[in-house]
Amino acid sequence: IIKIENKSEINPRIEHICILGSLRDRFENLRKLLAAEQPKRAIVFVNNNTELRQINEKLQYHKVKSTAIYGNASKEERQRALDSFRRGKCNVLVSSDLSARGLDIPEVSHIISLDFPVNPDEYLHRAGRTARGDNSGVSVCLITNKDIEILQSYEKAFGIEFTVKKLYGGK
């Protein structure tokens, strides 16, 4: 059981969605989600740098205009990736929670948690990267059966409801 001490506010202009699937299908579900939603700008959160790099490379292989910021990236590499994302040269930024701290990028339409955040503060931080100003936004979590209990605790604690969506099984 996860206990959340203080009830933090989540922007009411954020739509919360979860997509239930297996760990094995995570990348394919991400790819299908990006193709279906066609986000103006999306940040994809991944929990570790090795996987982060692999996800970015796979997205690029599938012709998704993506870039990544790594925890161990140089200041120049980080700035180059952020500039590319801000200027619209790419519309998907793959990042870890730590790398995304303090980012203020306008017009991020979608937040996608490839790894479900097991800490409520992480979810608040991730979701808070979208729906800035007067904009609305979407926060999508790709989850497995083991994440459902945590997701339900977030719904209760934050007073939100996740819409469960299915992705088409074909290509």
For each predicted feature, which ranges?
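Conserved helicase RecA-like core
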Residues: I1-K171
